[in-house]
Amino acid sequence: MRVGIDAHKMKCTTVMFDGDSVTGSFDFQTTRQGVYEFMEKVPEGSIAVIESSTTGKVLSRMLSGKYEVHMVAPPERKVSIKTDRRDAERIVMEDMLNYLRRCYIPSQYIENIRFVVTQQIQIGRRIARVKNQVHALLEMNMIQHELDDISDIFGVNGLKKLSKIQLPRHDMIALARYLEELKMYVSHHRQLDTEIARIAASDNDVQLLMTIPGINCFTAVAIKSRIGEVSRFATKKHLCSYAGVVPKANNSGEYISEHNHVKQGDIVLKYALTCAVRGAILANKNSSIKLFYRKISKKGVSPQKAQIAAARKMACIVWKVLSSKQPYTEQDDHMTKRKMKIMSSKAMRIIPTSVMPSKVSELVRNLVDDIDIIGKYHEHSDYIIGKDLSNKNRLKEDILR
């Protein structure tokens, strides 16, 4: 039996199909209890077809142990009549006819490291945002030139000099707030860096990727998290296409597209490959990636296009290393040992107890005590916070419940 599931945030619609006709349809809530009710109604071993979405990913993990789960890409064409039941019926029938592309369902391990890598990237962007705010604050007060002799104002010497700068009171308050925010993000970045190093230390594929010039611990884990099982890519060209480092085609009849756009692919994988290319370019020794980049650049190609071309070559090397389960043949032994040593030292760090799961409830209680209750109510609310303290207690109870 095949079962089509149209998954939504609050409710899922299910259509059961026996190969000839629809035998039944029912709805269930998108909760654990609702999924258990689904399992009671649908026989074990059935094929569950789910449309790719955030809710669909959660359902696929919960149903994968009991059913054969097919996660499919959403249909590209529009329909004149659209209901949840029709959508569920359409995806189950089109999947049976192989009209829809099936999506890769990563294992729980791959999902976990994907989450850690995404968090690290987000924290890095927040750090860059706060640093830009500090630079803008200094430029507004026309004192940026006083720090020209320092290459990085967020280094040890730069922060010492920054602490002696005199600014107007409101700007000093803003600077203190930015630095406090920066300190928090840097601490989180360090903790995630430790988690990534521990993942790398226990993953053979990641350590093989680190033998490639330009790929460090983070980029290796990022590449591994997005590729998952390399066996799902039949050739290196398939991996390059998945990463989006190949030209996009838009040909029709006698018309041949001559644009320079790159195919849309996995954003995180493309980001990791371009980071690896930049690392290989900045390395002291000449690698095949560095020589290839120089060759492309000498033809008058812009640096961005040359990096994408080198990223395609990097993707081919990654596919070869992961497929053969052998280290990169042109690896720099000294640099590889150095990267492994740095990885081991990071993995040995002790994560502060303040970020342990056991501390979550304590952190929530402390956060509730610091909440500005006035901001929780609209300015035209009937509640008067200053006179009715029971509102604050009720809000605490709601959050802690």
Q: What residue spans do the PLM features occupy?
A:
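Conserved DEDDh/DEDDy metal-dependent 3′-5′ exonuclease domain
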Residues: 37-78
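Nucleic-acid-processing active sites and adjacent nucleic-acid-binding tracks
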Residues: 21-45
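Short alpha-helix plus adjacent loop in nuclease-associated cores
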Residues: 70-102, 115, 255-264
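Low-complexity, acidic/Ser/Thr- and charged residue-rich accessory regions of DNA metabolism proteins
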Residues: 254, 293-401
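Glycine-rich, often acidic, oxyanion-interacting loops/wings at catalytic, nucleic-acid
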Residues: 121-206, 335
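A short, charged helix-loop
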Residues: 92-115, 156-167
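Phosphate-backbone recognition surface of nucleic-acid-processing proteins
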Residues: 79, 208-211, 217, 221-299, ...
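Gly/Thr-rich phosphate-binding beta-strand-loop-beta motif of the actin/hexokinase/Hsp70
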Residues: 1-17, 91
